[in-house]
Amino acid sequence: MPAGILKSGANVNAWSFNIRIVEIEIALRLGRAVTPAEALTLTVESGRALVDALTVSIELVDSRWLQAGAAQPLLKLADMQSHGALVLGDWVPYSAEFLGHDWTRQSASLQIGHQPAVNFVGSHTLQDPTWLIPIWLRHATSQGQTVSAGTVVTTGSWCGMPLAQKGDLVVADFAGIGRTTVQL
């Protein structure tokens, strides 16, 4: 996998982060390549048909500023959302059961360190994380590039952006989909 993309169970304790913000997400994998011409014709339904698998992911958001959260507001605005790492769980086939999945009832939980787990139900802002596939593919192909089969698309946080600390074990669990962990 590319640097910064890890498998569930990874230990990033030795990594240098300026801040450790956690997002739990559903990651989608494209089953085949998509050309710029095809991307222009996609609907939500045809976009869903491109997905061959999904997994639980944990995105670690970092900051380029040493002072991280204490940086001036405009500096934070320019910087927050810097990629620290992406941790992917086991891939689950995107089968017919997910085509009719009611994402507004999807439950997920996040546990950070020794804090109690926090539960979320239907908390994804798009309600259906596959909704963004056509829009994202039009953007990704807008300069004439074909998006490769196997490309992974993360779809946004189900938990907001809570902070974690060095040494914390982060556990993300999505009912019926899977579980992903990372040791900070």
Task: State what each model feature region is.
Residues 1-127, 169, 184:
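Catalytic-core "active-site belt" of small-molecule-metabolizing enzymes
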Residues 132-161:
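A conserved acidic, glycine/proline-rich C-terminal tail/linker
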Residues 114-115, 175-177:
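Glycine-centered tight beta-turn/hairpin loop motif at sheet-sheet or coil-to-beta transitions
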Residues 161-171:
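Short glycine/threonine-rich loop-to-helix capping motif typified by GTGT followed
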Residues 159-162, 176-179:
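Short, charged beta-turn/beta-strand-edge "cap" motif at the junction between a beta-strand
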Residues 156-157, 174, 184:
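Active-site proximal loops enriched in glycine and acidic residues that flank catalytic Cys/His/Asp
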